[in-house]
Amino acid sequence: MSTFQIHYFASASTYTGRNTESLPAPLPLSSLFDTLEAKYPGIKEKVLSSCSISLGDEYVDLVSDGEKSGNEGLLIQGGDEVAIIPPVSSG
């Protein structure tokens, strides 16, 4: 079975209790939040709604509630790395 790595930072790591985990690939990018919500109930609203997502070394838009992001056709492939990056504040 092919897998991809997902990296959790800050509040995403705290919520999941993990820094990284492997998930089955391929996975449509548009299904990522629903997949994580099934594993970690409440994460979508409490954490993911304000996070950025990177696939490899590029940020990607992931829009929910039926809106279009232009990334609906992207597939997360085996060996890919995804990062969940909460907002960063600076002073």
Swiss-Prot record:
<dbReference type="GO" id="GO:0030366">
    <property type="term" value="F:molybdopterin synthase activity"/>
</dbReference>
<keyword id="KW-0963">Cytoplasm</keyword>
<feature type="modified residue" description="1-thioglycine; alternate">
    <location>
        <position position="91"/>
    </location>
</feature>
<dbReference type="InterPro" id="IPR028887">
    <property type="entry name" value="MOCS2A_euk"/>
</dbReference>
<keyword id="KW-0501">Molybdenum cofactor biosynthesis</keyword>
<dbReference type="GO" id="GO:0032324">
    <property type="term" value="P:molybdopterin cofactor biosynthetic process"/>
</dbReference>
<keyword id="KW-0597">Phosphoprotein</keyword>
<comment type="function">
    <text>Acts as a sulfur carrier required for molybdopterin biosynthesis. Component of the molybdopterin synthase complex that catalyzes the conversion of precursor Z into molybdopterin by mediating the incorporation of 2 sulfur atoms into precursor Z to generate a dithiolene group. In the complex, serves as sulfur donor by being thiocarboxylated (-COSH) at its C-terminus by uba4. After interaction with MOCS2B, the sulfur is then transferred to precursor Z to form molybdopterin.</text>
</comment>
<dbReference type="InterPro" id="IPR012675">
    <property type="entry name" value="Beta-grasp_dom_sf"/>
</dbReference>
<comment type="pathway">
    <text>Cofactor biosynthesis; molybdopterin biosynthesis.</text>
</comment>
<dbReference type="InterPro" id="IPR016155">
    <property type="entry name" value="Mopterin_synth/thiamin_S_b"/>
</dbReference>
<dbReference type="GO" id="GO:1990140">
    <property type="term" value="C:molybdopterin synthase complex"/>
</dbReference>
<dbReference type="GO" id="GO:0006777">
    <property type="term" value="P:Mo-molybdopterin cofactor biosynthetic process"/>
</dbReference>
<keyword id="KW-0547">Nucleotide-binding</keyword>
<dbReference type="InterPro" id="IPR044672">
    <property type="entry name" value="MOCS2A"/>
</dbReference>
<feature type="modified residue" description="Glycyl adenylate; alternate">
    <location>
        <position position="91"/>
    </location>
</feature>
<dbReference type="Pfam" id="PF02597">
    <property type="entry name" value="ThiS"/>
</dbReference>
<comment type="subunit">
    <text>Heterotetramer; composed of 2 small (MOCS2A) and 2 large (MOCS2B) subunits.</text>
</comment>
<dbReference type="InterPro" id="IPR003749">
    <property type="entry name" value="ThiS/MoaD-like"/>
</dbReference>
<comment type="similarity">
    <text>Belongs to the MoaD family. MOCS2A subfamily.</text>
</comment>
<dbReference type="GO" id="GO:0000166">
    <property type="term" value="F:nucleotide binding"/>
</dbReference>
<dbReference type="GO" id="GO:1990133">
    <property type="term" value="C:molybdopterin adenylyltransferase complex"/>
</dbReference>
<protein>
    <recommendedName>
        <fullName>Molybdopterin synthase sulfur carrier subunit</fullName>
    </recommendedName>
</protein>
